[in-house]
Amino acid sequence: MNLRKNFLANAVACAVAGITVTAQSQELTKSLAPVIVTADPFGASENAMILAPAKVLSGNELRNKLGSSLGDTLGSELGVSASEFSTGASRPIIRGLEGPRVKILQNGMSTGDLSAISNDHAVGSGMMSATQIEILRGPAALLYGSGAIGGLVNIVNGRIPTVLEPRATGEAELRYSTVDQGTGLSFSADRSAGNIGLHVDGNVMNAGDYRIPGSSAVDSSNALNDTGKLGFSRNRENNIALGSSLIQDWGYIGASLSQLNKVYGIHGRDELAKIDLAQTRFDVDSYIKSPFAGFEGLRVKLGQTDYRHTELEDGTQPHVRFSNKAFESRWELTHLPIAGWRGKVGLQTEHSTVQALNLEGEDPTVPRTRSQSTAGFIVEERDFGDLRINVGGRFESVSRSPLDNTKRSFNLGSYSAGALWSFIPGYGLGATASVAQRAPTAEELYSGGPHHPTETYDIGDPNLKKETSKNIDISLQKTTEAFRWKANVFQNKVKNFVYGSLSPAVQGIADGMEFDRTFTQADATLRGAEAELSYNYYDPGWFGRIFADTTRGTLDNLGNLPLQPTTRKGLSFGYQDAQWRSSLSVLHADRHTRIASTSISEETPTSAYTRVDASINYVQRYGTTDVTWFLLARNLLNEEIRLSTSLLKDYVPQPGRNFIVGLRTRF
């Protein structure tokens, strides 16, 4: 214990010592100014969005928190945890909801991957290419899908230029991590040629098996128990994208083409596996100013994705190949104010073909299923003095057409209304109520085969009903001056909540599976609270933050929901000026004992942990070029960390102590 205290004291000293450079207030304030939430229909800043609680990561904050997956990057944000199946596959969990209930977007369009099906599937968007990541809840989520009852995450990488750069701009980054001997290189560049905007970006990442504090399995007698290093935790990725736009006074039209390749290992309970992923994506984005009388602008987006991944037993034997071919279109009209109301109306269509073929000649894990969706939506906002009202609605028709099974159709209606009272300048009290409906996915309806990475035999139910969520969210927030704070409480009641009930394998015995996972339904309730206090985040000098969040999810008459986040408390502090930024953060997660009933899950309690991270950034300026040298430290105490939200927590701990060193340049 004394060793840990001394280590922590030394870390604090290293994080803040020697910082004596005179602050250049205007430059720092400009670089730390609140950024616009691109997924918000009204283009609000993060601090202005009390009705739709939001968090935006960008700039150095994003680069310092950047992980190998989306869940790893966002897992310490307020109200957000991570599924953490492996270093290559981890999705964000928002207020206890995950999978298809959390929509993942790239530049406002669906990623087109299959990460919502299962926790072992990666998000189809490279983290190293992201320039901004937005977490959004509330009425704005209705623009992107009725199923996003938990919220949405939008990954922004600016691949289609929307403005003409007067000179070439860009950035590049090189980093090395000690825990896995990992290397990462990313770059992006923009320039213009006349009225043509040009963009290119790419990244390469290669990480080996990562070191762990002790043994991988809680039960040391496990046949796949590793000590000191976790086998099959390697992670490789490469990503390249090109984009171009015609930009004129009337607006713009542009397109981008990208290719993502990713190979990552999965260290399971009784099996080792590898996933080999490839995704090709083509996007079109256009905006026309004042297209008709009474309208401010028309935005049209098109996206086509060809996604596939192969699951390999023991890293060599192909077993199942998942694929998804998807096309999406979005049409948004922004109208001029009508009787003080401002807003958007739009249309969204989605077409996809999903299948999971068993390469050993057995029945498909998921049969070839064609899904179609057509939706209309509207979001409106108006100020009445100190009171702001926000309303939205979405009406959607969804069909699932499987090969050799029952076709299902669903009519969905989702509504949201909120009010914000600015009772004192800089303070706001907000309340939002919403009803949202979600259609079961093809996997929930029609699965019928083994899934080796999760060691389950998945069994769908073609008679599942649509989910209906009723959510209430109350927020209180202070958004000005040095001390800022916010607090939220929420309740979400979900009728016909779809979940996978685990039981000892019967149908899966012949395939060597540990469990049968049967998709079924029950009513569920999720409640929680979040609070955060920050000091001086937008000015030079000392800054700090403390926060806490908690969520409780239950199935009516069946006990706790499985794999729920535990209560967390955290603090961070540091110093910043125009050249230096240093910080130290501590996150404590309580022991998790509110586990699911053994009749629906084999869940076990999770031990408490304390994670300590630190960072130092130093900026050198050469004309219009900035060079930032950085040193990041993660899990400084080399704590054994297991997440209550991870299906493999008893077999796959988080990485041990890790130092990341690198540099990035912006020009």
Name each model-derived stretch.
Residues S110-P139:
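Short acidic/polar hinge/loop motifs at secondary-structure boundaries
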Residues R167-E173, S177-D180, G184-L277:
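Periplasmic-side early beta-strands and strand-to-turn transitions of outer-membrane beta-barrels
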Residues G208, P213, Q437, K495, ...:
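C-terminal beta-signal and adjacent terminal beta-strands/loops
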